[in-house]
Amino acid sequence: MIKKELGIIGIGKIGSALLRRFINSNTINHDNIIIYDINYDRLKAISNEFDVSIAKNIAELVKISNYILIAVLPQVINTVLEEVKEVLSEQQVLISIAAGITINHIKTFIPKSVGIIRIMTNSPALIGEAATAIAINKDVNEKDLSFAKNLFRSVGIVVELDEIHLDAVTGLSGSGPAYIFIIIEALADGGVKMGLSREISIKLAAQTVLGSAKLLLETKKHPGELKDMVATPAGTTITAIHELESAKLRATLIRAVEAATLKSRSLNSSSFK
């Protein structure tokens, strides 16, 4: 087969969402991509939708891809790496989005001087609004790093960090959308309790979160400053904030990020080796 720029192993929800954004943003041409998934029906459907090549197996994909994006669950990445290592060359680059799987863990399967890029993104990649963090090993050059950054800029913002921080990124922005959905749902429940319809309550709550986030990013003001702009003396907002503080909302969110971070670290434990 003709050499491909990008091979994607795993075309589940995130893998297919990334593929969609890569192509629709014109970051990479469809005929420069090859994909593989253990679910052949899904693989065929995605191939037909985006007009991309499919591989018969992992080995075939690796042999003809310059960059290999591994988009599988951490629980099965060892099995994938066992197959990848048999045909991987030192000129290729591995890109992994498996949560909690460190570069050193991958290196135990890939002893060669292969460039490894670890990615932590999140579910808003589905609509091109992801928050993505990238970490690399010493074998990744500027060209390879630029390729990965350009890919993931097509799904949102990208930051480069030392790998030691990626588990915290997992706890904050990786799991963060779920926290925000709970907050939106709870705000909507409050609206319903006070007499608004469910539909209107969800719409208002979601737009409030979206608008507040945009205001923060565009003004670059500290969130506390923006909060104080809304909380006027003896007003409704400061009264509500008092309730949130009494219920220890801040501490609960901090503990949630901490718990998810520790769980991410544990995913690379001996149970996966």
Regions inferred by a protein language model and the residue ranges of each:
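Rossmann-like NAD(P)(H) cofactor-binding subdomain of soluble oxidoreductases
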Residues: 18, 40, 50, 58-134, ...
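NAD(P)-dependent Rossmann-like dehydrogenase/reductase catalytic/cofactor-binding core
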Residues: 2, 206-273
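Internal alpha-helical scaffold of NAD(P)-dependent oxidoreductase catalytic cores
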Residues: 105, 109-115, 131-168, 181-218
